[in-house]
Amino acid sequence: MALPDISSLSTIASIGGGPIGGGWAAHFLARGFDVRAYLHDPAEEPAFRAIIETAWPCLIELGLADTASLERLYITSNLEDAVAGAAFIQESAVERLDEKQDLYHKLGKIVGADIVIASSTSGLLMSDIQARCDIAARTLVGHPFNPPYLLPLVEVVGGAKTTTDSIDWAMAFYHHAGKEPLRLKKEIPGFVATRLQEALWREALHMVANDEASPEDIDRALRFGPASRMAVQGQCMAFHVACGEGGMAKNLDQFGPALKLPWTRLDAPELTPALRNAMVDGCSDMAGGESFKTMAAQ
């Protein structure tokens, strides 16, 4: 069955009234879509609207689509009503497997087999979420970074029953909707960005627990150090450029032994030739032939 034409897609269903659901709704409204928002409890509506109203000035500053309007928001506590006419569904319900499984079971009974449903889950696996869904082939993870209306990353990965064309479609849709989708190679708990964030978070907690640094020390160290650099080049490219000519190969060959130094409470992987070559080749591909002088200037 053919999936919706992305270029003419106009209506999106957003499920969930929390910060993620509200943030997604704000983003889609700013991009000029009609948004049909499902709230489990009507009492959630004031807080949900407040999230969007808080986000809107930022979105105005960033630039709204010509057709963007808060008037294009429709709120309901009827699930079937929410998904009626929607060509894409972004699910941001409570982060509990049993509740998500129940929700996807219901969606499988009322949503067409040509509609992709993406979950904002930050840690659950789609293979588990889709277990009881009749249209599991169209279900996948579309995990944003919070707030979704400001941070462009969306991690996209399917479950055991998800079809490749559903993932292809989701990648194209998120691009169309102004996001920066990252297609994961395989389904892993926590995906990519959250696992990296969690490693940093655990190390920070260790330093505070051992009275080695205060929370303020840690945040200042990041804000005025690696965080600024990583925003420009990312972790891998920053280390690729750091050693000048020779790049990642020189970095790993020179500093590889430092992986065994007690600089972290996390175990370092073994620096095998395969790992070394994967890092070197990956950074060379990202560099795209640019000189180290040019990359350093950036």
Predicted segment positions?
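Active-site-proximal catalytic alpha-helix in oxidoreductases
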Residues: 23, 148-157, 176-177, 182-212, ...
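NAD(P)-dependent Rossmann-like dehydrogenase/reductase catalytic/cofactor-binding core
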Residues: 2-7, 31-33, 179, 210, ...
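Hydrophobic/aromatic beta-strand patches that form the interior of the parallel beta-sheet core
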Residues: 36-38, 76, 90, 140-142, ...
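Rossmann-fold dinucleotide-binding core
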Residues: 119-186, 190, 194
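Rossmann-like NAD(P)-binding element
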Residues: 43, 58-116
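ATP-dependent carboxylate/acyl-activation modules
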Residues: 2-5, 14, 19, 24-31, ...
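NAD(P)+-binding Rossmann beta1-loop-alpha1 motif at the extreme N-terminus of oxidoreductases
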Residues: 1-62
